[in-house]
């Protein structure tokens, strides 16, 4: 009880230990320009030269006009003032940041603040990782859930030593043993507590050897080749000194490693030969007694000494001159005369001081002008690639000795914690495919770098009072660079991708996690970092698809032999060069492709007039200036920019409720409003590579990429096979459609309002790839008196009251055609673009009114105009209502509260079509004729279609249904989480929302989007190759899902036919069922039997099972360590969710659907797993059964 109370007190006092600091603003109008992590508190917010600068206890954030800088404080190595007004920040990962200030005093103030912030901590608790963990635990404690294990690494890390001994197959009976001589670190503080040594070496001999080796780092075995039994061992240098000291126990131990290796290999060979002889020679009686005895020989420890061992290779990472010079300090190297049957090789690797100078030269080079004339020669002069080459050659020498020559290897340098882990970890990575997996790589880092005492605190500069700059050196970064070189040479051999390594580089220095704190395991145990901080492996876990290499093949080369020449190595641009820093799309960095047919006299497309704010757009609109040339660098358009790069990781049809046309897909060119062919989406700033990727996505999937960053793109309309059309209805909820009246030109002119004439006159005929409406729709709503609509917060109660009290202003047939999901029609964010105009209030009330009437009234459809684009085949298309951006939602919210006035009429803001209205109406009215049959099944689910309406200027208006970009928290609160226009989100936000649990904040002009940053507060890193691979994979999965649904539909229809024939044979049909054949052959719209919704299929008669009436028992939380569906481990971000139907525990991605569960008395949409969702979600019946009343089903 006392211990429980003590723990509860610790939980209560957790965030009192790390209190938030008071925010100091240089300007009262400034806001924090980023979303804070748990435990993060912003201390200063101010203005720099054309930038906003903010400083917290975790990061420095500088938001420029068209880019941003986001760097953890511990990643900054130094700050100095240059040119009086400029701060020069040097980072530990080779980056350099420059920030200009308007005044000298302001520059000096920020210089002092930054120098105080980056100073090495006086105590380790001052590092942010402790505050981050404490606040995370505080949040989880308030949720009354146990999440402490989510901050921990997996079992493969915590039990790594035992698992590795078993996996590598050490013979622990005769050749090797596990020594506990270093228990509680009483022998060596920088060594692990368990060591593998030859079986006949006693602990007393080990103590004697420890006195002879530097820092008592005795030779210990760390790897065994599973085929030939050769081992790799590591140690510190021998302390020979100028006196030439010897140690007999040390010489005996080194030779015993080779003998134990020979004994182990003989034992393994005998076991293999025994299995082969029993398998290949079942009648093995012909073998002689000598051969039989030798095949089963199991030599003891004494007999193994008589075996002839291979010559042991002692690899000294230093040069011979450096090794001899170390004798003056009491060190030295092994003398071949004293170590018989051993070979000593010197590799000539540079020490940490040379590596540090080389890295500083590289950093200076990377921060120069982007294209220096002597780039290659200057890069060669840094010798950075040369040092990488020597390191790779050293590791390759170990691989040759172990794999080809079957020789044991002993590796050391001076102290054994810098160059030694570089060589042995790289050699193990080349030798063993397990270490090239995500889990294996984590084990490799933990064992060779953390357990064997690499001095991360001193080398990275975040230790307590670690002011000695001579101790700092990017040793671990250099090793990760070598791993990156291997990834380039063997792209299919690594399970993790480059983003994994970039994240590891960032968090080596960031101190967000406690994995790389302190200098050794003993210090980490004393400071309790494992219990008081989060592990970086909780982020870089194996289940995180963002870090998986889609080219990985487990059947690739078992042993890698890389090319180590300098000419084959490449600079790691993702880490060293400043190019990957997040930036907003600018016209300088990416100009759209030229549009065919444009006039040469038009202004160039690469430079567009710049409008800075929402108010400027209003003023421009009032001055009748064309608005279609607005730049995408404006903050109000920036919100969704980063999702363009990140959404490429998903396919353009990654919506849960969407179908992919697997057959008969026809590629037809998109057309701009001006008639030009649209080849790529506008507004891409990462270069033309992403444009190419986007085009490739369209070619791969046959579906246009959804709208990004406020630009509208004309979608392609695809035809779908009948089965795909039929199955598409099973995934979508009912869609309520309305019909717009047929209006002639005179009627249009009579209803023309001032806003319509304004927009029709202000829109140019030719555009450069942007939709005409992308900027014109930015204007605020205005009433008849041209007053802006006040911004209010939406109230669901008021909406409901208005819906009940509103009388119909116009008949049903006069209402505009809008595609609104029935389950989401009450969401204020789902009000479509088409309703924008000075007389918008009536249309909103129509939507609310018809939400109630849609259950009983006949559904009316419109037919799109096929003549204007040449892409329609006369089939009905269902429009999907696009969602306004977040900056515009408050205005739409306020519209929902306005009352209807009888005198108001409905008007639309529309863009002109390329064809005149008279040509567009050849045989078919542009707004469509009244349809009597429900053709919803003919529309492929989840496809955005083109809508056309007549406009006062005599053109046909093109409307594209854009996909909604709601925040994830908004989606989860809605009842249509899986609808096609609500589901599009990138995979990275899953970790953010489950990890942080923070409320979302609205963006302001000074507040950039969170999408610029990753879930850990670091800049987003994107790999275009991996993005394209994810598109291909997602497309393949969608095709498989489509085929599965088609097969299920066919199976259901066959079962239905079988049941029908069986019932008819038995004569058991009732009156209701026997009326179905009449309705199937009756095409009369007024047929009563076709309106019946009581019988959807003959297969609806099911026997009631006893278990259907029982409540499902939930699986307890503490019994579920992995997701029931995908088997991914639960951790800090992967939360546990119960399925309300089956009771099993799933991760958020496997349990993200909502549907009513009547069997559990849950009549509101509740969270269920995917399998239960497919069984509970009502599927469409036979394609011939077309109902006027939509089947009541939720779209989530």
UniProtKB/Swiss-Prot annotation:
Membrane association type: Peripheral membrane protein
Subcellular location: Cytoplasm, Cytosol; Membrane
Recorded GO MF terms: phosphatidylinositol-3,5-bisphosphate 3-phosphatase activity; phosphatidylinositol-3-phosphate phosphatase activity; protein tyrosine phosphatase activity; zinc ion binding
Start and end residues of each stretch annotated as Disordered: 587-612, 697-719, 855-900, 993-1019
GO biological process: one example: phosphatidylinositol dephosphorylation
EC identifiers of the protein: 3.1.3.95
Biased composition (Polar residues): 993-1008
ZnF endpoints (FYVE-type): 1117-1177
Binding site residues for a 1,2-diacyl-sn-glycero-3-phospho-(1D-myo-inositol-3,5-bisphosphate): 326, 351-352, 414-419, 455, 459
Chain positions recorded as a 1,2-diacyl-sn-glycero-3-phospho-(1D-myo-inositol-3-phosphate) binding sites: 326, 351-352, 414-419, 459
Pfam family, one: Myotub-related
Entry-annotated residues carrying Phosphoserine: 8, 613, 633, 647, 651, 907, 1062
Listed GO CC annotations: cytoplasm; cytosol; membrane
PANTHER family tied to this protein: MYOTUBULARIN-RELATED, MYOTUBULARIN-RELATED PROTEIN 3
Domain notes: The coiled coil domain mediates the interaction between MTMR3 and MTMR4. It is essential to bring together CEP55 and PLK1 during mitotic abscission.
Family note: Belongs to the protein-tyrosine phosphatase family. Non-receptor class myotubularin subfamily.
Name under which the protein is recorded: Phosphatidylinositol-3,5-bisphosphate 3-phosphatase MTMR3
Organism: Mus musculus
Gene: Mtmr3
């Amino acid at each position: 009880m006392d211990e429980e109370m003590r723990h509860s007190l610790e939980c209560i006092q957790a965030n009192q230990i790390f209190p938030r600091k008071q925010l100091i603003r240089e300007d009262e109008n400034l806001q924090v320009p980023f979303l804070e992590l748990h435990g993060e508190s912003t201390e200063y917010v101010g203005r720099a030269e054309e930038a906003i600068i903010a400083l917290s206890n975790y990061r420095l954030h500088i938001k420029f006009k068209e880019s941003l800088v986001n760097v953890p404080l511990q990643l900054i190595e130094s700050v100095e003032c240059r040119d009086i007004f400029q701060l020069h920040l040097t980072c530990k990962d080779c980056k350099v940041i420059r920030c200009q200030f308007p005044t000298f005093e302001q520059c000096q103030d920020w210089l002092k603040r930054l120098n105080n912030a980056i100073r090495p901590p006086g105590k380790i608790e001052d590092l942010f990782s402790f505050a981050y963990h404490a606040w995370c635990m505080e949040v989880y404690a308030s949720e009354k859930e146990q999440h402490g294990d989510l901050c921990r690494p997996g079992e493969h890390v915590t039990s790594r030593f035992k698992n590795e001994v078993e996996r590598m197959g050490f013979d622990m009976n005769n050749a090797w043993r596990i020594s506990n001589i270093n228990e509680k670190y009483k022998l060596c503080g920088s060594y692990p507590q368990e060591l593998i040594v030859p079986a006949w070496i006693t602990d007393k001999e080990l103590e004697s050897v420890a006195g002879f080796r530097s820092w008592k780092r005795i030779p210990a075995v760390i790897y065994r080749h599973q085929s030939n039994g050769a081992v790799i061992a590591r140690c510190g240098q021998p302390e020979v000194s100028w006196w030439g000291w010897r140690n007999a126990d040390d010489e005996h131990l080194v030779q015993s490693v080779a003998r134990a290796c020979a004994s182990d290999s003989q034992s393994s060979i005998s076991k293999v030969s025994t299995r082969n002889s029993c398998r290949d020679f079942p009648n093995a009686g012909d073998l002689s007694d000598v051969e039989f005895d030798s095949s089963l020989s199991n030599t003891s420890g004494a007999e193994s000494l008589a075996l002839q061992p291979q010559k042991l290779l002692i690899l000294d990472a230093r040069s011979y001159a450096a090794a001899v010079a170390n004798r003056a300090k009491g060190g030295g190297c092994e003398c071949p005369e004293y170590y018989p049957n051993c070979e000593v090789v010197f590799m000539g690797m540079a020490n940490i001081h040379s590596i540090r100078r080389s890295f500083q030269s590289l950093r200076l080079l990377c921060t120069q002008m982007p294209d220096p004339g002597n780039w290659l020669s200057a890069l060669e002069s840094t010798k950075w690639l040369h040092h990488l080459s020597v390191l790779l050659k050293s590791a390759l020498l170990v691989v040759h000795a172990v794999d080809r020559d079957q020789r044991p290897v002993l590796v050391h340098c001076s102290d054994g914690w810098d160059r030694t882990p570089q060589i042995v970890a790289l050699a193990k990575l080349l030798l063993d495919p397990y270490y090239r997996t995500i889990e294996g790589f984590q084990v490799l880092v933990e064992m060779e770098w953390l357990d064997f005492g690499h001095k991360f605190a001193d080398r990275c500069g975040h230790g307590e009072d670690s002011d000695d700059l001579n101790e700092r050196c990017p040793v671990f970064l250099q090793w990760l660079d070598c791993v990156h070189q291997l990834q380039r040479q063997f792209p299919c051999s690594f399970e993790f991708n480059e983003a994994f390594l970039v994240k590891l580089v960032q968090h080596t220095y960031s101190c967000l996690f406690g994995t790389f704190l302190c200098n050794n395991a003993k210090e980490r145990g004393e400071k309790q970092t494992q219990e008081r901080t989060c592990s970086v492996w909780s982020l870089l876990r194996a289940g995180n698809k963002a870090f998986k290499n889609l080219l990985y093949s487990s059947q690739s080369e078992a042993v890698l032999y890389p090319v180590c020449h300098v000419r084959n190595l490449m600079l790691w641009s993702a880490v060293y060069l400043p190019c990957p820093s997040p930036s907003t799309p600018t016209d300088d960095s990416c100009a759209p492709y030229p549009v065919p047919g444009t006039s040469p006299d038009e202004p160039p497309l690469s430079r567009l007039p710049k409008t800075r704010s929402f108010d400027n757009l209003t003023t421009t609109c009032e001055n009748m200036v064309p608005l279609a040339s607005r730049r995408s660098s404006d903050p109000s358009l920036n919100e969704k920019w980063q999702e363009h790069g990140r959404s490429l990781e998903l396919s353009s049809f990654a919506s849960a409720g969407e179908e992919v046309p697997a057959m008969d897909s026809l590629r037809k060119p998109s057309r701009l409003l001006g008639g030009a062919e649209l080849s790529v989406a506008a507004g891409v700033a990462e270069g033309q590579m992403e444009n190419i990727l986007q085009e490739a996505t369209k070619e791969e999937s046959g579906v246009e990429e959804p709208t990004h960053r406020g630009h509208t793109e004309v979608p392609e309309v695809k035809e779908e096979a009948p089965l795909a059309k039929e199955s598409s209805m099973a995934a979508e909820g009912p869609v309520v459609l309305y019909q717009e009246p047929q209006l002639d030109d005179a009627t249009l002119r009579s209803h023309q309002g001032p806003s319509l004439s304004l927009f029709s006159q202000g829109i140019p005929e030719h555009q450069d790839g942007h939709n005409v409406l992308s900027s014109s729709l930015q204007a605020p709503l205005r009433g008849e008196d041209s007053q802006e609509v006040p911004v209010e917060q939406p109230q669901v109660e008021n909406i409901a009251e208005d819906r009940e009290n509103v009388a119909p202003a116009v008949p049903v047939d006069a209402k505009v055609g809008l595609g609104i999901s029935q389950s989401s029609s009450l969401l204020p964010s789902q009000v479509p673009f088409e309703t924008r105009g000075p007389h918008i209030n009536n249309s909103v009330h129509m939507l609310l009114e018809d939400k109630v009437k849609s259950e009983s009234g006949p559904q009316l459809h419109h037919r799109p105009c096929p003549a204007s684009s040449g892409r329609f085949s006369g089939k009905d298309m269902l429009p999907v209502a696009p969602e306004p951006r977040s900056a515009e939602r408050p205005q739409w919210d306020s519209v929902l509260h306005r009352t209807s006035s009888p005198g108001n009429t409905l008007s639309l803001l529309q863009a002109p079509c390329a064809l005149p209205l008279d040509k567009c109406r050849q045989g078919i009215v542009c707004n469509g004729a009244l349809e009597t049959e429900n053709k919803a099944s003919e529309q492929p689910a989840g496809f955005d279609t083109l809508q056309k309406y007549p406009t006062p200027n005599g053109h046909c208006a093109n409307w594209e249904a854009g996909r909604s970009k709601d925040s994830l928290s908004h989606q989860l609160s809605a009842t249509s989480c899986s609808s096609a226009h609500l589901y599009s989100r990138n995979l990275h936000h899953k970790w953010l929302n489950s990890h942080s649990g923070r409320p979302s904040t609205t963006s302001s002009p000074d507040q950039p989007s969170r999408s610029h940053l990753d879930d850990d507060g670091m800049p987003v890193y994107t790999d275009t190759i991996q993005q394209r691979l994810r598109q291909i994979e997602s497309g393949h999965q969608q095709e498989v899902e489509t085929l599965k649904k088609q097969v299920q539909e066919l199976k259901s229809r066959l079962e239905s036919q079988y049941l029908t024939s069986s019932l008819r044979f038995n004569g058991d049909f009732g009156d209701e069922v026997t009326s179905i054949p009449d309705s199937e052959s009756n095409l009369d719209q007024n047929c009563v039997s076709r309106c019946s919704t009581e019988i959807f299929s003959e297969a609806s008669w099911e026997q009631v099972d006893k278990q259907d009436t029982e409540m499902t028992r939930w699986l307890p939380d503490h019994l579920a360590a992995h997701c029931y569906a995908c088997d991914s481990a639960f951790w800090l971000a992967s939360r546990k969710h119960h399925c309300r139907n089956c009771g099993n525990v799933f991760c958020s991605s496997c349990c993200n659907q909502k549907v009513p569960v009547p069997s559990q008395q849950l009549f509101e949409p509740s969270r269920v797993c995917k399998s239960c969702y497919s069984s509970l979600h009502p599927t469409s019946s036979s394609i011939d059964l077309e109902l006027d009343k939509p089947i009541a089903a939720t779209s989530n």
